[in-house]
A protein has these predicted regions:
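Conserved GNAT acetyl-CoA-binding A-motif
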Residues: 102-112
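Short glycine/proline-centered loop/turn elements that form peptide/ligand docking sites
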Residues: 91, 95, 116-120, 137-142
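Conserved hydrophobic/aromatic "anchor" residues
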Residues: 31, 64, 85, 123, ...
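Acetyl-CoA-dependent GNAT
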Residues: 5-84, 88, 92-102, 151-155
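Conserved catalytic-core motifs of GNAT/GCN5-like acyltransferases
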Residues: 110-114, 125, 130-146
Length: 156
């Protein structure tokens, strides 16, 4: 496995990953916008099989993460790992790749997640994110959002 910057060539696999996980929050145009934004950090984790790289077929995308790095207040916009690859540390690697770019002790990273997504909430809490608020009826279907904050000052 290796982490690298997301490129436009990754979009078919990124969109496929969203379909696999049954969430299609973003479309191709939105991903393109993030890849091109100077303040966005778009990371992918890919399988380094024998048949990928150096002009051969593309490596299988295992997961991705998108952060907005906005000085002291960054945001995790999206993170996903193929279902078959979950619980293997890929999500943790992707998350840490973004959080490691927070270098000042006062830097923070924010995120929102569906209140009912217990699995994701446990993942974020395991990595040092603290729940700081609930945003009522945030999503189009009326579900609440759980708002989390990661601070460099608090231990991971």
């Amino acid at each position: 496995m290796r982490l690298r910057e997301m490129t436009e060539d990754d979009l078919p696999q990124v969109l496929e990953l969203q379909r696999e996980l049954a969430f299609q929050d973003w479309n191709e145009k939105q991903f393109l916008s993030e890849i091109r934004a100077s303040y966005a950090d778009c990371i992918v984790c890919e399988d380094e099989g024998r048949e990928c790289g150096r002009g051969k077929t593309r490596c299988k995308l295992l997961g991705y993460a998108i952060f907005h790095l906005l000085g002291p207040n960054s945001e995790l916009l999206s993170i996903a790992t193929r279902e078959s690859e979950q619980r293997k540390g890929i999500g943790s690697q992707l998350l840490h790749a973004g959080l490691d770019k927070l270098t000042d002790p006062d830097d923070q990273c924010f995120l929102e997640v569906r209140n009912s997504n217990v699995k994701a909430r446990a993942f974020y809490e395991k990595h040092g994110f603290k729940l700081y608020s609930i945003r009522k009826k945030y999503y189009a279907d009326g579900e609440d959002a759980a708002l989390y904050r990661f601070s460099r000052r608090s231990p991971r």
